[in-house]
């Protein structure tokens, strides 16, 4: 296995300096900031990553305003009250990528977020309270309880 230091040095070399490399890295939020996030943001990010999987990301990004309009800014509460026939109508809206299987994940993941929030106060609090030394356990949870959040989709959404 290649040593981390070798990988790091190669990255520094490619970017020109440690400062330039570090400028490209994001700073993770602390638990307090994560806990303050609105649960609708999680649903939006899960949905974005589900749709980006298997598509050109630029296509999804270009249509994202349409997704937000069609799905009420990913309001968990509104999506939980949506009747099934309305979901079919929304899945055929030209403002979004019309992939019914992926559209079905939106209310399914809204339900998962709602269920977790009922037990933990909010989905954000659940994420903030998750032990940082068991991130793989969180990925497994999302895979098991979420819709299409296995593989890299769940981990990418948590970034």
Regions found by a protein language model. Give the residues of each.
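Short hydrophobic alpha-helical segments that form membrane-spanning helices or hydrophobic packing faces
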Residues: 154-159
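Alpha-helical ds-nucleic-acid-binding substructure associated with the helix-hairpin-helix region
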Residues: 72-145
């Amino acid at each position: 296995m290649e040593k981390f230091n070798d990988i790091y040095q190669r990255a520094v070399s490619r970017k020109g300096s440690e400062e330039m490399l570090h400028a490209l890295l994001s700073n993770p939020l602390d638990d307090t900031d994560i806990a303050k996030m609105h649960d609708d943001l999680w649903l939006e990010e899960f949905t974005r990553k589900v749709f980006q999987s298997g598509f050109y990301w630029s296509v999804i990004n270009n249509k994202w305003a349409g997704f937000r309009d069609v799905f009420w800014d990913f309001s968990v509460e509104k999506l939980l009250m949506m009747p099934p026939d309305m979901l079919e109508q929304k899945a055929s809206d030209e403002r979004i990528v019309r992939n019914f299987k992926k559209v079905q994940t939106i209310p399914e993941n809204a339900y998962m977020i709602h269920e977790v929030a009922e037990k933990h106060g909010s989905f954000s609090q659940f994420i903030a309270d998750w032990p940082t030394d068991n991130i793989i356990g969180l990925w497994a949870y999302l895979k098991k309880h979420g819709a299409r959040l296995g593989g890299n989709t769940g981990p990418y959404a948590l970034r």
